[in-house]
């Protein structure tokens, strides 16, 4: 059965047989906490996305999507082949290419910060990259039509 935000709140109230004001006013928080726990505990297919982008010549950093939570894989697409990069720690990439002007086809990547990947070696030309990742879907409490992945 598909739930809207309204029908989910009603179902919770019916199940708990509780219409007390404080309980009812906290249902949104209760639902958000449940969504968050499911997101952290289960790697469901509905939490996966893939995007393509370009790693630019001489740029060792690659921007992450705005809804990014965690990577599954990153690859360079050469003609029809995909070359998967190995995920490493930043220090391993800095040991591998201590000079950021060292260029080539990227072989490794790391989380530089919350919004950026670090590539090594630095791309020697423009490469099409494909990222498979986990993202945070819109909460049923924030959805415009009151529906979501639940």
Indicate where each model-derived feature is located.
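Glycine-enriched, solvent-exposed interface loops adjoining structured elements
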Residues: 1-150
């Amino acid at each position: 059965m598909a739930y809207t935000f309204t029908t989910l709140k009603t179902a919770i109230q019916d199940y708990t047989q509780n219409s007390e004001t404080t309980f009812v006013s906290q249902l949104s928080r209760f639902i958000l906490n449940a969504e968050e726990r499911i997101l952290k505990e289960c790697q469901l297919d509905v939490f996966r996305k893939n995007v393509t982008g370009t790693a630019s010549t001489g740029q060792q950093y690659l921007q992450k999507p705005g809804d990014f939570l965690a990577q599954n894989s990153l690859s360079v697409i050469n003609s029809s082949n995909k070359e998967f990069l190995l995920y490493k720690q930043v220090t391993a990439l800095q040991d591998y290419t201590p000079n950021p002007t060292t260029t080539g086809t990227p072989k490794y990547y790391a989380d530089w910060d919350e919004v950026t990947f670090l590539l090594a070696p630095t791309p020697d030309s423009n490469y099409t990259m494909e990222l498979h990742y986990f993202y945070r879907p819109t909460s049923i409490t924030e959805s415009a039509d009151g529906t979501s992945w639940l």
